[in-house]
Swiss-Prot record:
Functional pathway: Carbohydrate metabolism; tricarboxylic acid cycle; oxaloacetate from (S)-malate (quinone route): step 1/1
Keyword field: FAD, Flavoprotein, Oxidoreductase, Tricarboxylic acid cycle
Lineage: Bacteria, Bacillati, Cyanobacteriota, Cyanophyceae, Synechococcales
Entry's family note: Belongs to the MQO family.
A single MF term (Gene Ontology): 2-hydroxyglutarate dehydrogenase activity
Designated name of the protein: Probable malate:quinone oxidoreductase
GO biological process: tricarboxylic acid cycle
Reactions catalysed, as given in the entry: (S)-malate + a quinone = a quinol + oxaloacetate
Cofactor(s) needed by this chain: FAD
Gene it is expressed from: mqo
Alphabetical list of InterPro entries matching this protein: FAD/NAD-bd_sf, MQO
Record flagged with keyword Flavoprotein: yes
PANTHER family referenced in this protein's UniProt entry, alphabetically: L-2-HYDROXYGLUTARATE DEHYDROGENASE, MITOCHONDRIAL
Pfam families (UniProt xref): Mqo
Amino acid sequence: MTSSKNPTNDNSYFDAVLVGGGIMSSTLALLISEVLPDIKFLIIEKLNAPGSESTGAFNNAGTGHAANCELNYTPLDEKGNLKIDKALSINRSFETSMSLWASLYEAGKIDIKKFLKFIPHISFVSGQDNISFLKKRFQKMTENPEFIDMEFSSSFDEISSWAPLITKDRNPSTQIAATRIGRGTDINFEALTKEYLSLVSLNKNVEIRYKTELVDLKKIDKKQWELEISSEGRKTSIRTGYVFLGAGGKTINYLQKSKIPEAKSYGGFPVSGKWLICEKKDLTEKHNSKVYGKADIGSPPMSVPHLDTRWIDNKKLLLYGPFAGFTTKFLKQSSYFDLFSSIKKNNIFSMLDVGFKNNDLINYLISQSLKNHNSRVENLKNMMPSANSSDWYLKNAGQRVQIIKKTEAGGSLKFGTEIVNSSDGSLSALLGASPGASTAVSIMVKVLEKSVFFLNDKHNLQKKINDLIYPELSDSENNSTFIKDIKKRNNSIFGFHP
């Protein structure tokens, strides 16, 4: 297809195309619409509604990630020193998300009641070694303004008052400890995605197409991409100056189709999940927190159990898990050939190397997949001793695709998220999983900063973003006073009183 001399008047041309209708694409769409309102862009989503795959309320493995209670974000190094850098980074990123929501809510643009509820976050451990670890973590983290309000207790009665289902039917002489942060949250990212896109759709320069899938993409000249898309069996071609690939696990397949040099070193490792869910009101009303345990030594990060209070479709539920498993699908609603189609000559050796190095992980995932209902409930009893199998049912969670990256040593399996950018800023892709949705605003700001839109107007656009997220605040994100000011502002707008 030849390029148009005046693409802005061409119905098949868009300044940007965002692939995927989940929290990542919707966050980027919101940012573009707010700071670049004249940009003509298209969002395409394979399913018939936004936020239905990885962003879906039951599909999202963890909500309200702020590193308050997730112990795998504060590991010990080889010398036994506690590392909290990742926890600090995640917490600051989550506060950035909170700041954007506060700005939009204050302006009357979104309704926080549809997606945000405050609820305590608790870390819970048993055994002297784990208690010592938790105490060390508490002491180190409370030195920082992000976690200054954290409480520690090894009192059975006090922990019982925080989370009664954790101590019911537990021997009172058992050595246990917990930390608690009252300013935790439960976020329904599916509902938030719908809020974002409802707002974005008011912009006359934005088009959203559901039941529309990316088939192929290629660079046709220095400034344009051609995308082949399919909607209910009908294929068409569109052109754009910028592409964002935010299609969850399928992003790796699309990134490979782009053939940008930066994509060559990547592969994907899919992980499935299942929840135990309780709807019984006499139990859901007794548990008002998110409680994270500690993974067994040598267990993978996705094995960390948590018992969450969640609000989904205006209903209060308890979710335990997710129990990880192995699959070759990259999305719940995709193909079992996803993994095999992602194997290319430039990543096959790194993927095989990861397979050999992580044989224990693969065996773990397979063993988790083979668990029956009773064995899953027995696992739940480690956190909730009074659990009764008849009160819980099983439901599939979403798919996660962990990053496999080529290294000098072969291949490396990464647990996290990573942005891949083309050298000219015309394409960006988001790979990976946790912490994901909770840090979407910070991640999408980075995506926007590396895009073609920042090439000629970086200073002005950066100011617009800062004014949107941090109005009346101007300082480094790493400055402790700035962090305190952000939390104070957000608490005031949301009506949260510590």
